Amino acid sequence: MTDLRHYDVIVSPSITEKSTLVSEQNQVVFNVAKGASKPEIKAAVEALFGVKVTAVNTLVRKGKLKRFRGFAGKQKDVKKAIVTLADGQSIDVSTGL
């Protein structure tokens, strides 16, 4: 049984053109919680998907400034994790948990 905290760490898979390109290098991209650390992300991916993780790289994409009905606003910042899997391991993010 997986710990419920793992579901709070991994928010959603990031399915973009770049994330599908890095999947060829045995990497998967996830949107993660802002306060999540690399060891927490590694433990969550290994527990939820049953795979071996070799590396975790993180980045914070700053929210864009947008206008809505004449008022200036800002989109939220998003933290992403690029997870490198061990050789022979794979995750199908389209099926979900």
From Swiss-Prot:
Stated name of the protein: Large ribosomal subunit protein uL23
GO biological process entries: translation
InterPro entries recorded: Nucleotide-bd_a/b_plait_sf, Ribosomal_uL23-like, Ribosomal_uL23/eL15/eS24_sf
Role this protein plays: One of the early assembly proteins it binds 23S rRNA. One of the proteins that surrounds the polypeptide exit tunnel on the outside of the ribosome. Forms the main docking site for trigger factor binding to the ribosome.
Entries under Pfam families matching the protein: Ribosomal_L23
Subunit structure: Part of the 50S ribosomal subunit. Contacts protein L29, and trigger factor when it is bound to the ribosome.
Biological source species: Rhizobium meliloti (strain 1021)
Keyword Transport: no
Domain of life, per lineage: Bacteria
NCBIfam families assigned: PRK05738.1-3, PRK05738.1-5, PRK05738.2-4
GO cellular component: ribonucleoprotein complex; ribosome
Gene3D superfamilies with a match to the protein in the record: 3.30.70.330
Family: Belongs to the universal ribosomal protein uL23 family.
Keyword annotations of the record: Ribonucleoprotein, Ribosomal protein, RNA-binding, rRNA-binding
MF terms in GO: rRNA binding; structural constituent of ribosome
PANTHER family: 60S RIBOSOMAL PROTEIN L23A
